[in-house]
Design a protein with these regions (language model features):
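Loop-helix junctions at membrane interfaces
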Residues: 1-142
Length: 142
């Protein structure tokens, strides 16, 4: 039991470190080009790296490891000055947790590739719906 707990904590901490590293990497890149809609190249790279870490750690360490990494990474990114505005942090954290929950709960039922697609589409839809609502609610100018 003790070894499992130590492994869980150690790997989860490594996942948090990797997600923060991915966010820092995205922060040092130039503003970038628009890819599609509101997405920039920087956002696409950073988001893809973060999601990759969340998928890997959810699959390798467990569902709750991924959820913890997803929740804490958003808060830590904000505290380091690299995350979104404060009112959006809980929305992004919940989007990350949703990604991990969907992927983790579907594991073994469908192919991992299909699970990745389903989880990513749900997270994207969740963020596309809620982030603009939160931004408007707090009165952030366009």
């Amino acid at each position: 039991m003790k070894d499992k707990t130590v492994r869980f904590i150690t790997f989860t901490a490594m996942g948090i470190a990797l997600v923060i590293l991915a966010q820092l990497l995205g922060n040092v890149l130039p503003a970038g080009f628009t890819v599609v809609g509101p997405f920039t190249g920087k956002q696409l790279l950073t988001g893809s790296l973060v999601n990759c870490v969340l998928f890997v750690f959810t699959g390798a360490v467990g569902l709750w490891s991924g959820v913890i990494i997803g929740l804490l990474s958003s808060l830590l990114a904000y505290l380091f000055g690299i995350g979104p505005i404060l009112p959006v942090v809980p929305v992004v954290a919940c989007g990350n947790a949703l990604l991990c929950l969907v992927f983790g709960l579907l594991r073994g039922k469908l192919s991992d590739w299909l699970n990745v697609v389903i989880a990513a589409v749900l997270k994207c839809g969740f963020l596309w719906l809620l982030v603009p609502l939160v931004v408007r609610a707090v009165g952030v100018p366009d």
